[in-house]
Each structure stands twice: as structure tokens, then as C-alpha cells.
Regions:
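A short, histidine- and acid-enriched strand-loop-helix "catalytic/donor-clamping" loop
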Residues: 36-37, 86-103, 117-118, 151
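Membrane-proximal helix-turn-helix segments that form the acceptor-binding/catalytic region
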Residues: 53, 79-83, 102-121
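A short, active-site helix/loop in glycosyltransferases that binds the activated sugar's phosphate group
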Residues: 114-141, 148-150, 207
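Conserved donor-binding/catalytic core segment of Leloir-type glycosyltransferases
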Residues: 160-179, 197
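Nucleotide-activated donor-binding/catalytic signature segment of Leloir-type glycosyltransferases, i.e.
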Residues: 206-226
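Acidic donor-binding loop of glycosyltransferase active sites
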Residues: 233-247
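Short hydrophobic beta-strand element within catalytic cores of glycosyltransferases
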Residues: 237, 261-264
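A charged, aromatic-enriched C-terminal amphipathic alpha-helix characteristic of glycosyltransferases
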Residues: 297-328
Length: 329
């Protein structure tokens, strides 16, 4: 694309934003965020607002993409658009319409969505929710799932120590409130033939160092990108947990990238995307050990399913991104 594109995010890590920027040829700028304490978070939001507007004035983009969880990021784009010729594409995180769509942010969200040219939404279930609960924007909604990430070329399958004779699973986590990691670990204590690595900064869950390793699991803490991909590449299967609807999990896309068997929470949104190609965990009400056994017994079949699904989803995504580009050029 010959237009000047910029993609701005305010978060800690957003593989979606980074990957989407690459595919679009957009300059990607992530200003970060602060979650706690509340006063510091509010101050950070205000600072990021002015930094973002200043970026727009310096770069003079023709198309602005915002990773829209909080409305202030797209407000900066909407104000810039008022005085400059450009298009605004708000990439809506589910928090935008599930967590921040209430007083006092509801009216601000509606105003900036009205000013935006396109509202990217991450899956069809979210599109249905949006149309049913927030009417008036159906003409602006464009469904675009995450691109399946490219695995770094230097990443090789790595032997995972301490797990001889066991099948290895990687539970990908950020220890968010919607991820029932601790109940999961409690339930796998009786499963003898598996070993689980759990990624992510577990200090957010107030886990003590003595709880960071058990007989058949180990919490890795936060890993840099290379070590993270090496861990995933060395696993027999990948696990992703959520109790939250209307979200597709990064771990699911990463499992597709590596063509790894996937155990994932059973939500309508995830079922709509992955169909019958993965093993579903019934929100921890079912038999976790049995679900793992199902994958272990049919590892080759699940891997073949993921390989085929990857081809289908890549082709679908290529068609969608072409459609998006045609809308903004």
C-alpha cells in the first residue's frame, strides 16, 4: 500500500496489532499501559492520549489504526481526523463493548465509533453481539480474525527437561481474571503421564514461589519471545483457558501456527472458529484428565486437523485482508 499507515496500541503485548501492522505495511507504535494503581492508570491514559495525538501530527498518516480497548485512543484519532484528511479504523478489543461500554465511557465510545470509518471486530460471534446490543453500526463492522502468526525461522523443537517419559503440554496464560489456571492445576494433580508448563507472569495471581512448581507442572514466569516459541515448539500439545465469550485466544492462533494439537475452553466463540478440530475443555466441569488422554491417544489426528485448518484459515484471512485494503485505498 502506498498510503501512510500508522497502527497505535496502548498495551503491554499485542501480537495481533504487531502482526496486522506487518501485513498492512503500517508503522506500529505501542505506547504501553499501566494497570495499577488506579490513579497511575488514569494518569497514563491521559499521557498516552497526548502522546498519540502528537504522533499523528508528526507522522501525518492517511490511515490510522487504533487498538481500541479504551475509547481515548480512538478519540485522539477522531480529533486528528476532524482537522486533517485521513481515515480511522478502530480495531475493537472485546473490552471496548463488554467492559468499557457503560457510564461514563458509553457515550464517548458511541461518539468515536460514529466518527471512525471502519470498526474491526475479531469474530462473527462478536459481530452478532454488537449488532444485537449496540445497534446503529452494522455498516461499519468488518470481521477480521487475528492473522496466524509467523513462527520465527530460527525456532527449533527443543527438548524440555524434567519430563522424560511424559507428554508435555503448554498452558499459555496471562493470569487474567477469566483464566481459571489454579483450578486447572488442582485438577491435573492426579494425571500421571503428563507434564504442564504454564507461561505468564504468575505474580499477578499472588502465587508464592513454593507454588510455582508441582509434581507435574511448572510455572515459567514471563518468557522472551524466542524462549516462548521454543517452549511451544517442544510441546506435544497446547492449552488455552478462558471463561469469557466473544474472544479468540492468542494461544489458539499460535497452536495453528505450529500445527500443534489444542485443548481449549468450550465457548460458542471458540467452537465457531475451531469447529471439531480441537479438544474442548468444558469450563472445568468435565474430566480434564480424560480430555488430555483424548488428545494424547490421537495426537497425529489432531495435528493433521490443525495443519488442514491452518491452510483454510490462512486462505480466509488473505481474502478478508484484501477486502479491508480495498475499503481503505
Amino acid at each position: 500500500m502506498k498510503q501512510r499507515l500508522i497502527f497505535v496500541a496502548w498495551n503491554q503485548i499485542s501480537r495481533r496489532s504487531a502482526e496486522l501492522s506487518k501485513r498492512l505495511g503500517a508503522e506500529y507504535i505501542n505506547l504501553g499501559r499501566v494497570d495499577r494503581p488506579t490513579l497511575k492508570r488514569l494518569f497514563n491514559l491521559v499521557v498516552n492520549f497526548f502522546r498519540t495525538y502528537s504522533l499523528f501530527r508528526d507522522r501525518r498518516p492517511e490511515v490510522i489504526f487504533t487498538f481500541h480497548a479504551h475509547p481515548l485512543i480512538t478519540l485522539a484519532a477522531a480529533i486528528y481526523k476532524k482537522f486533517n484528511r485521513c481515515q480511522v479504523v478502530a480495531d475493537l478489543h472485546s473490552a471496548a463493548y463488554l467492559d468499557h461500554y457503560r457510564f461514563p465511557l458509553k457515550s464517548l465510545n458511541r461518539w468515536v465509533w460514529k466518527k471512525a470509518d471502519i470498526l474491526l471486530i475479531h469474530n462473527r460471534m462478536s459481530q452478532n453481539y454488537f449488532n444485537q446490543n449496540i445497534p446503529g453500526y452494522s455498516g461499519k463492522l468488518f470481521v477480521l480474525e487475528d492473522p496466524i502468526p509467523a513462527v520465527p525461522v530460527h525456532i527449533r523443537k527443543k527438548y524440555l527437561y524434567g519430563v522424560k517419559g511424559k507428554f508435555v503440554g503448554i498452558l499459555v496464560s496471562r493470569f487474567s481474571d477469566d483464566e481459571p489456571v489454579l483450578p486447572f492445576l488442582e485438577q491435573i494433580k492426579e494425571v500421571n503421564n503428563i507434564y504442564i508448563y504454564v507461561t505468564g507472569n504468575y505474580t499477578k495471581a499472588r502465587i508464592t514461589p513454593d507454588q510455582a512448581e508441582g509434581e507435574n507442572y511448572r510455572l515459567t514466569g514471563f518468557l522472551d519471545d524466542d524462549k516462548y516459541w521454543e517452549l511451544l515448539a517442544g510441546a506435544d500439545f497446547i492449552i488455552a483457558l478462558t471463561t469469557r465469550e466473544y474472544t479468540l485466544l492468542s494461544a489458539g492462533y499460535e497452536a495453528l501456527a505450529l500445527e500443534k494439537p489444542l485443548l481449549i475452553s468450550d465457548t460458542d466463540t471458540l467452537r465457531e472458529y475451531f469447529q471439531e478440530n480441537v479438544e474442548y475443555l468444558d469450563r472445568l466441569t468435565g474430566d480434564i484428565g480424560k480430555s488430555m488422554e483424548n488428545v494424547i491417544v490421537d495426537l497425529d489426528d489432531y495435528q493433521r486437523n490443525m495443519s488442514q485448518l491452518k491452510q483454510v484459515k490462512n486462505a480466509e484471512w488473505d481474502t478478508k485482508i484484501t477486502g479491508l485494503i480495498n475499503k481503505i485505498v
